[in-house]
């Protein structure tokens, strides 16, 4: 019994140490890790674009590439989503390349800009869809998310201001499930009424010598409700007569 306990404990500690060693960022460029990271990130990107095509574009015909001006739609909730997505994708990719042991310069150059590059591909898909179109506002929001990450790395060497996201289901989705989503996994992307985007400020990081705990953050949120369509003038009161579009801070 003792031998089994000792062997089990030793195996657990060894496995834990192996995992910790594997997860620890390399001190210098680890080519095998880099190759794995590039292949994995490429495969995930292609898979995500294929899935997005099925979820978002498959039901609508293709068109010639075109631009639209959607800056006034959805009370800019879609633009907040672009900022968040670009930031988080860039953050994930930068940390992945840090794990590979890439230089700080290359981490920022190839990692942090991944979010912008991926979302530019999505924008191209928008541009060829008859239902949507490429948006300069979306591209600007994507660039803003990337800039938020890169600027903090260059200025402070850490992320003190982090975009965050929360979601709850709403009654609006059932009014237009084709636009706002049929299921929870569709609504979390499509139903802007249930989304909230936050800018979370880590208090301790701004006052290093204070007794403020590291976990304490001050967050400012933005959301909107009452949206059945992108533009207020397109709302058909048959969908939801009591619908009143409004912002929430």
Predicted segments, located by residue:
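Outer-membrane beta-barrel translocator domains and adjoining extracellular loop/strand segments
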Residues: 176-178, 231-237
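Short loop/turn motifs that connect adjacent beta-strands in outer-membrane beta-barrel proteins
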Residues: 29-34, 98-110, 151-160, 205-216
């Amino acid at each position: 019994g003792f031998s089994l306990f000792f062997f089990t404990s030793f195996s657990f500690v060894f496995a834990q140490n192996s995992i910790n060693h594997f997860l620890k960022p390399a001190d210098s460029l680890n080519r095998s890790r880099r190759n794995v990271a590039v292949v994995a990130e490429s495969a995930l990107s292609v898979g995500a674009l294929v899935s997005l095509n099925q979820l978002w574009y498959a039901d609508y015909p293709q068109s010639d590439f075109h631009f639209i001006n959607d800056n006034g739609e959805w009370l800019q909730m879609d633009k907040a989503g672009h900022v968040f997505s670009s930031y988080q994708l860039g953050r994930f990719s930068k940390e992945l390349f840090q794990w590979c042991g890439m230089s700080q310069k290359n981490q920022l150059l190839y990692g942090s800009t991944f979010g912008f590059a991926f979302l530019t591909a999505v924008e191209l898909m928008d541009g060829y869809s008859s239902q949507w179109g490429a948006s300069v506002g979306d591209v600007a929001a994507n660039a803003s998310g990337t800039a938020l990450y890169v600027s903090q790395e260059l200025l402070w060497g850490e992320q003190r201001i982090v975009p965050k996201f929360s979601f709850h289901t709403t009654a609006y989705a059932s009014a237009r499930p084709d636009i706002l989503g049929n299921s929870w996994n569709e609504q979390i992307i499509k139903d802007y009424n249930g989304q909230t985007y936050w800018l979370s400020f880590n208090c301790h990081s701004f006052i290093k010598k204070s007794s403020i705990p590291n976990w304490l953050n001050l967050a400012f949120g933005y959301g909107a409700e009452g949206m059945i369509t992108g533009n207020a003038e397109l709302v058909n009161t048959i969908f939801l007569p009591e619908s009143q579009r409004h912002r929430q801070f």
